[in-house]
């Protein structure tokens, strides 16, 4: 496997040359500044993103479906405390971890999602189970947990999700609220759902993946722990088909990351697909348009997309987004900061 390529996503390509990418992933967007990132943490992110890409690529290389590749890549990120999904999920206001995920098949438009689950190790696996083994698209809370466990998804005790960094973030935000220095919708400069970041845009974080298999089928998935200090059963865009995740072989596979309320209002993932289908935009132009529209609404975050020809769109309006892609030959490209 190749080393890290820290070059711009928009690096020039020789005339007539086309690199076909088979997977693109993200690990959250936010104020990710090189000045606030230690070399050790930066390396840890690069290694985790590369491991996720490799896991997905291995599925594709072996001839498995793009859905399997997406699930495998997201499993790696869910199992890492670095990302706000699975093991690294943030805490709600009452000190719990409530996780959301969704997955979609571009060939059939079938989809599955779970929201507000508290004891499932890998929520993306539960979303896949909902898609494959039920007549439903979304299941929530205890019902989703019972269904997922009955269909082979691993369960864990609540203590599995505890990380000191996430707990400390919650305590800082609660302290600010109690002293009147922060309301729920304020951004706490010291609290982050995205490890290794500083400044604004820090309550949220998500992981996502889009894959293109040997049969030419696309799949997309997204998983998250939501917003730090979220309250009262809040659900963001990650499990919402059309907002956090959308996939259609006719256009692209898409996964979002950012302030979920804005992505729901924009119906961001479907908006990107519609711009390609109805306006004839390329995948990267459509991604750029969606992020521009979200920015004008007052939202921030990023989006990744992959079309059937292996073209990638990666756009964000924050200083950084953990992201990467791998081409059909297994060449890995990893990016963190705005290039």
What residue ranges belong to the model's regions?
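C-terminal motif of bacterial Sec signal peptides marking the signal peptidase cleavage site
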Residues: 5-8
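Alpha/propeptide regions of enzymes that mature by internal proteolysis
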Residues: 12-339
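Sec-dependent N-terminal signal peptides
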Residues: 1-2
């Amino acid at each position: 496997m190749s080393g890290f390529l820290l070059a711009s996503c928009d690096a020039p390509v020789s005339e007539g040359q086309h690199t076909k990418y088979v997977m693109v992933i993200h690990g959250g967007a936010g104020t990710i500044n090189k000045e606030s990132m230690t070399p050790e943490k930066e390396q840890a992110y690069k290694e985790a993103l590369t491991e996720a890409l490799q896991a997905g690529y291995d599925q594709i290389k072996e001839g498995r479906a793009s859905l399997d590749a997406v699930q495998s890549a997201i499993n790696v990120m869910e199992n890492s405390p670095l990302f706000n999904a699975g093991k690294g999920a943030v805490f709600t206001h009452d000190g719990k971890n409530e996780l959301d995920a969704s997955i979609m098949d571009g060939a059939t438009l079938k989809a599955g999602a779970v929201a507000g689950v508290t004891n499932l190790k890998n929520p993306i696996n539960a979303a896949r189970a909902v898609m494959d083994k039920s007549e439903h698209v979304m299941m929530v809370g205890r019902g989703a947990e019972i269904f997922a466990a009955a269909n082979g998804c691993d369960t864990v005790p609540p203590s599995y999700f505890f990380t000191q960094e996430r707990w400390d973030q919650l305590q800082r935000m609660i302290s600010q609220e109690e002293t009147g220095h922060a309301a729920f919708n304020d951004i706490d400069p010291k609290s982050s759902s995205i490890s290794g970041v500083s400044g604004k845009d820090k309550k949220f974080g998500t992981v996502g993946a889009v894959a293109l298999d040997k049969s030419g089928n696309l799949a997309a998935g997204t998983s998250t722990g939501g917003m730090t200090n979220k309250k009262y059963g809040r659900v963001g865009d990650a499990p919402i088909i059309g907002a956090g995740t959308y996939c259609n072989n006719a256009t692209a596979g898409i996964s979002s990351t950012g302030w979920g309320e804005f992505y729901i209002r924009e119906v961001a993932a479907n908006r990107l697909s519609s711009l390609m289908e109805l306006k004839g935009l390329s995948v990267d132009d459509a991604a750029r348009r969606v992020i521009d529209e979200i920015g004008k609404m007052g939202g921030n975050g990023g989006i990744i997309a992959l079309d059937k020809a292996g073209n990638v769109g990666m756009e964000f309006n924050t200083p950084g987004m953990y992201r990467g892609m791998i081409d059909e030959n297994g060449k890995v490209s990893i990016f963190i900061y705005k290039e």
